[in-house]
Amino acid sequence: MQMERTELPDFFKELSTLVEDAHRYAKVAGVNFFKQNFRRQGFLDTSLTPWAKRSLTIGSDRGVLIQSGKLRDSIHAVSRGIDRIIYQTDPLAYAKIHNEGGYIVVTERMKRYFWYLYMKSTGSMQKRKNGELRQNKANERLSTMASFYKSMALKKVGSRIRIPKRQYMGESATFMKQLDTWIASEIDKRFSNI
């Protein structure tokens, strides 16, 4: 009596494929998760921690930390072997201070820049034919911006400006739970019929 040979599934091959797919999924899903924090306007760990509102509320139709989108678009994943992924941003000067919060020391260059912004905003105010300023919303907005720029320009060199923590990247229990759920479903899918 001769027995039939049955092909045994290659568990190790299937497992290594799963590890590679999980690594790829974690890189993409992590970057997307951290970019979602810009839409959420806060950091999602176990619950959402909303970001502090900006002090100058002009232009509030756009979200906090969103001006050009460079910070959000600079988030990417770097592989450190098959068992480690690091999420980071491109080397933007303001990325770390926004994520962690802290203080900025006022420099002479900053003061000159704020004087420039002040002059630019007051110069673009609309005037009547007799030279008086018009009483309209555009001028009101420019006036508010101009007073903010002037107050920043008048700060003493060496004084400190507090930048609130607006975390957009870091350890997140919600993301880890999503990743665990995905891996568990993939294990069920791949190994249930073997």
Predicted regions located by residue number:
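Short, Lys/Arg-rich flexible segments
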Residues: 1-194
